[in-house]
Amino acid sequence: MFTIDYNSYRTLEPYGKRVRFLVLHYTAVDFAGSVKSLTTGAASAHYLIPDPTDPSYRAAGFKGQKIFSLVAEEDRAWHAGVSQWAGRSGLNDTSIGIEIVNQATDVGGVFTFPDYQTSQIRALKQLARNILQRYPDMTPKNVVGHSDIAVGRKSDPGPKLPWKELAEAGIGAWYDEAVKGKYLQQFSDEMPERAQVIQAFSRYGYGVETPASDVFFRALVRAFQLHFRPENYDGVLDVETCAILYALNEKYA
């Protein structure tokens, strides 16, 4: 039996942590259903943030806001599925997933997005800041929604997640209003060509099709709007959406 010496020498660089993305989700079911699907089903996530007003949460004997750890961060959770971001695919291997209990619905493509509880957002801020402190590769652009990395397939965490508020708390990306205004003025005269816009989406991190079908392009625009222009996520590339995209690339890309 040979002894492994863990102490005499340690590599300082080059090496990096496996985890570089933080992916936010909603569960689309109540607490009881969320726990069942995430602990006994095919899906899993590292953390679950319940809704303390959920009757099934209280029925389970809990009260007040909690955060549940379901999978150790060093282990892979099955939350991202078929996914792409920043030139990488299959993000289960390189991400931490946070599921938030929120009973959003999709009935034949018609969505309802309930508000998140204030305590859930406070819990998310606490948890996300703690995670970000430990993973330096989680840059603002690498804090994403499931809809960002699974364009056309997923809509979570939906337009009710306060991404701007999170960014102001140091979690994720947001654009500068002044830079957005600059591009609003520029694009009010002439919008970029569609191929240029697709390139801009790719530059920011989105997985794109080249050439992009009309269906995919609309889904791509909608995914972006769900995150950065939640007041209107109709999938139509208008001047404001384009200005926000270019403002983000100027700030982060």
Regions found by a protein language model. Give the residues of each.
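C-terminal extensions
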Residues: 251-253
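Generic detector of bulky aromatic hydrophobic side chains
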Residues: 54, 60-61, 71, 147, ...
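Basic/polar, cationic surfaces and motifs that engage anionic cell-wall
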Residues: 109-212, 219-233, 239-247
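Active-site-adjacent loop/helix surface patches within enzyme catalytic domains
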Residues: 1-137, 141
